[in-house]
Regions:
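Histidine-/acidic- and/or cysteine-rich, low-complexity loops and terminal segments associated
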Residues: 1-71, 95-96, 134-139, 160-182
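Juxtamembrane transmembrane-helix termini in multi-pass membrane transport proteins
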Residues: 2-5, 58, 67-112
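Residue-level signature of transmembrane alpha-helical entry/exit and packing/kink sites
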Residues: 15-19, 62-66, 103, 107, ...
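Divalent metal-coordination and catalytic microenvironments
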Residues: 38, 77, 109, 152, ...
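Alpha-helical transmembrane segments
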Residues: 61-76, 140-156
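A small-residue-rich subset of transmembrane alpha-helices
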Residues: 98-128, 202-214
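Transmembrane alpha-helix/helix-exit interface in multi-pass inner-membrane proteins
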Residues: 116-134, 144-172
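Alpha-helical transmembrane segments of helical membrane proteins, especially in multi-pass transport
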Residues: 155-165, 187, 191-212
Length: 214
């Protein structure tokens, strides 16, 4: 039993170390991006006449860099809150079938895939707003009406039954595991996807406020 407990602790340390590594890399990417001529910042440059230079056209490179920025932001914002769920899942999976580190990592992968999907959607939305002339170089909406509508919608959404249902599953590891448990590797990935969807259901409107505040 002592050896088994030691293996469980070792697996949990690996999971925590990997999550911290992802968050650290994401933070470093965002910090480094502040000093790089990222496409989103090019529109802030001034030419010789003191006039702002227009932001560059959307290319595959700009899309990928913007996607990386969004994904890094999602990682640093959402992974810390997912750690308790991942560790709780790991402890339950260990009791059911040891070792479970592979399934725990599949759970984490499913969770991150949801936020990757959201990041792709955010880039598409950013592209649409930019093409419509509704986005400033600081990534803020230039339309007061649109900003107001997003703020009101985000506030109202907090009181909906959908938000509350998602919140119960997202913030309570015990409730989620008891109602959403799936066995095996495929089940671990599916649970990660489900947990990610529930957490996305809690936060997606709040994430859109990034377009209001920049």
């Amino acid at each position: 039993m002592g050896l088994l407990a030691g293996l469980h602790r070792h697996d949990r340390l690996i999971v925590v170390a990997l999550l911290l590594g992802v968050m650290l890399v994401s933070w470093l990417y965002l910090i480094a991006g502040m000093d790089l001529p990222m496409p989103a910042m090019d529109g802030m440059a001034m030419d010789g006449m003191g006039m702002p230079v227009a932001a560059p056209a959307w290319t595959a490179t700009r899309f990928l860099l913007t996607l990386a920025m969004w994904l890094a932001m999602m990682a640093v914002m959402m992974l810390p809150g997912a750690v308790p769920m991942l560790l709780f899942y790991d402890s339950i999976a260990q009791k059911r079938s040891s070792p479970a580190i592979g399934r725990t990592l599949l759970f984490a992968l499913g969770y991150l895939l949801v936020w990757l999907g959201f990041s792709v959607g955010a880039v598409v939305l950013q592209y649409g707003l930019d093409r419509a002339g509704l986005l400033s170089p600081l990534l803020r909406t230039t339309s007061t009406a649109l900003s107001g509508a997003v703020l009101v919608a985000a506030g109202l959404y907090q009181w909906t039954s959908l938000k509350q249902a998602c919140l119960r599953q997202c913030r309570s590891p015990l409730d989620f595991v008891m109602t959403q448990w799936r066995g095996g590797n495929g089940g671990a990935l599916a649970m990660g996807l489900r947990h990610g969807v529930f957490c996305l259901g809690c936060c997606w409107m709040l994430m859109l406020l990034l377009f209001v505040g920049g």
